[in-house]
């Protein structure tokens, strides 16, 4: 199964693509969709949708796993929620089934504790995907953790 993990954001959307054929997890791609903070939010969301479309067309995921936004008070809360809506809409448009996980569930699935530290989750990602180097940037590593959670929780 090919799974696209997504760590939503407006400035940076982390993505990670894994393949789980033959009972092993393998990283195929990871990175970020970056938008320019100096332009209108609507244009930034169009960029996110466009880049996500390209990823979907390239990798043809059978499942998308998206981090569920947990509410907190911040000046970026609304824009992140809006960007997440664009991501969900784009996945639906391409009929990619989607599952959502809150951060604590991702930490629990990978590190065994919902209160695990970021480095514990990163170590688990590296171990599960047999990586010698940590994926960069952090948003991409987070997206791989989300994709792995999608696989583990299926």
From Swiss-Prot:
Name this polypeptide is given: Crossover junction endodeoxyribonuclease RuvC
Task of the protein: The RuvA-RuvB-RuvC complex processes Holliday junction (HJ) DNA during genetic recombination and DNA repair. Endonuclease that resolves HJ intermediates. Cleaves cruciform DNA by making single-stranded nicks across the HJ at symmetrical positions within the homologous arms, yielding a 5'-phosphate and a 3'-hydroxyl group; requires a central core of homology in the junction. The consensus cleavage sequence is 5'-(A/T)TT(C/G)-3'. Cleavage occurs on the 3'-side of the TT dinucleotide at the point of strand exchange.
Named cofactor requirement(s): Mg(2+)
Species this chain originates from: Prochlorococcus marinus (strain MIT 9303)
UniProt binding sites for Mg(2+) 2: 67
Binding sites annotated in the UniProt record for Mg(2+) 1: 7, 139
The enzyme's E.C. designation: 3.1.21.10
Active site annotation, chain numbering: 7, 67, 139
GO terms, biological process: DNA recombination; DNA repair
């Amino acid at each position: 199964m090919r799974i696209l993990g997504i760590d939503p954001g407006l400035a940076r959307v982390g993505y990670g693509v894994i393949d789980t054929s033959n009972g092993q997890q393998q990283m195929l791609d990871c990175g970020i969709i970056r938008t320019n903070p100096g332009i209108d939010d609507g244009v930034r969301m169009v960029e996110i949708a466009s880049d996500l479309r390209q990823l979907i067309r390239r990798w043809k995921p059978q499942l998308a796993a998206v981090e569920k936004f947990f509410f907190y008070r911040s000046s970026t809360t609304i824009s992140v929620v809006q960007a997440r809506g664009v991501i969900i809409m784009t996945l639906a448009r391409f009929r990619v089934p989607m599952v959502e996980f809150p951060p604590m569930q991702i930490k629990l699935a990978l590190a065994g504790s919902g209160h695990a530290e970021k480095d514990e989750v990163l170590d688990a990602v590296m171990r599960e995907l047999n990586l010698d180097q940590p994926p960069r940037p952090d948003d991409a590593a987070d997206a791989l953790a989300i994709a792995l959670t999608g696989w583990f929780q299926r």
